[in-house]
Amino acid sequence: MKFKFNKNGNNNFLAKAKVAIIVGYFYQDIGDKLLSAAQETLAKYGINANNINVFYVPGAFEIPLLAKKLASQKLSNKNLYDGIVALGAIINGETPHFEFVCNECARGVSDVSYQYEIPTAFGILTTNNMEQTIGRAGGYKGNKGEKATMAMIEMLYLMQQVDTQTF
């Protein structure tokens, strides 16, 4: 038996989903484009705008800490958030700083998923220059805010299927 999210199927399971979006605003214009695509994707799949909270952090390095804090929050002994989308940009400069920030950010976001079993999508651009960044924030390479949000939605579906054993 195969288990895969049907993008054209019944998405009622998303109606009550609560999602946190964390945006690094070091590159505000890029963050805004990623956020817009993420919000459009959530709306397209029926997630109520009132169930979406957007949090802004100074940069990508700060995203994992807030993601961990949000993932740890409970309401009636249940996770407050069903999914988290991390958005931002890290652009390579002239120093090794890029490597450190990228590695720690990616590790931190993935650790949140593993520790709290909450789909936490990595929509943080790691690029060599601004042209590549713009290309991935709605330009010639699409919008990674949309793609990360879709990954989170698909994982929400699969996690629900595994939890309820409704295959």
UniProtKB/Swiss-Prot annotation:
It catalyses: (2S)-2-hydroxy-3-oxobutyl phosphate + 5-amino-6-(D-ribitylamino)uracil = 6,7-dimethyl-8-(1-D-ribityl)lumazine + phosphate + 2 H2O + H(+). It comes from the Bacteria. Pathway: Cofactor biosynthesis; riboflavin biosynthesis; riboflavin from 2-hydroxy-3-oxobutyl phosphate and 5-amino-6-(D-ribitylamino)uracil: step 1/2. The keyword Transferase applies. The keyword Transferase applies. GO terms for molecular function: 6,7-dimethyl-8-ribityllumazine synthase activity. Its EC number is 2.5.1.78. One of its GO terms (biological process) is riboflavin biosynthetic process. Keywords: Riboflavin biosynthesis, Transferase. One of its GO terms (cellular component) is cytosol. (2S)-2-hydroxy-3-oxobutyl phosphate binds at residues 94-95, 136. It is an enzyme of class 2 (transferase). Forms an icosahedral capsid composed of 60 subunits, arranged as a dodecamer of pentamers. Catalyzes the formation of 6,7-dimethyl-8-ribityllumazine by condensation of 5-amino-6-(D-ribitylamino)uracil with 3,4-dihydroxy-2-butanone 4-phosphate. This is the penultimate step in the biosynthesis of riboflavin. This is 6,7-dimethyl-8-ribityllumazine synthase. The gene is ribH.
